[in-house]
């Protein structure tokens, strides 16, 4: 019995060591026309992509501006996430404009229902969506009366409540990212790894980013984490 228990423990530890993170990043600063442009969203996506590109346990792809179309993002998720095993992490990061129930790509809307349909195809335990957009909290709602999203095994980490703006950092600060992504990037680089075990969990990331954004914004922006997931879910490891 003792030997059997050791075998199980070893198998679990091996799976954690081998677990990988597969990421699709998208950010749009320059929308079609000029009235809807943002300053830093493309930089946001590139900053998060860079973290995972440099991480030996991760793979990432990034689309910005005119390349961040609805179909390109869907195709990228299909191509990237099919590589994931059951104990890996699949992740979508988006920075740009949002709408209730979805996000605004370069050429149209990408709804959460579509993202969930894509993620549902893959037998992966750990699924993550990061969204940096004004009124991001509204993005988990739609006009559909039969909303099954709360039953999905997906972690949503949104940059602000449904009534709040998601702030861009002032030009004079030297940062080229939004406030949420500044702290998300720092957290993913290791700042949020509170127990220093080189594995960052959902709870650790939420605590770090939420406290940082709330303090830096003067209590005007409050990131929210929502969904059906384990707080000990790994997000990235080093």
Regions found by a protein language model. Give the residues of each.
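Cysteine endopeptidase catalytic domains of the caspase/legumain-like
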Residues: 2-6, 18-238
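Hydrophobic h-region of N-terminal signal peptides that target proteins for export
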Residues: 10-18
